[in-house]
């Protein structure tokens, strides 16, 4: 009789199979929404909802990005916005009256940081951080631009 060995179960972040379209996870989104309604300060739930509902959006939007010359240049450069938005010296060069100036005022007023929000987005994620894949990069870019939408619309986190 052969002894069977138990296979080790993965305990760390899981790799995403980028060859398969991602599906929306409605149940996950609903559970996170209910938790968020119970505690509006639980920012982790916001990112759970976003991940659950995004489905294949990052892949589709990345393909759209590549349809323009400027988009192709952005994709080629692959600048990580959380790093750029965390560079206070760079932020301080942005002129008053610009979107960048409004972003600086937002950071000063709220005490938020781009890296802090990026960290929260991974607080319960079962995927690796900073995966080097075009769709993952684009998903991070969409996450990091989210604060800019708050600034432009005047929508506050509270």
Residue ranges: model-predicted function:
Residues 2-65, 72-78, 89:
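Extended, charge-biased low-complexity segments
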Residues 47-158:
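Core of folded catalytic or high-affinity ligand/protein-binding domains
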Residues 1-2, 154:
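Short intrinsically disordered, low-complexity coil segments enriched in acidic
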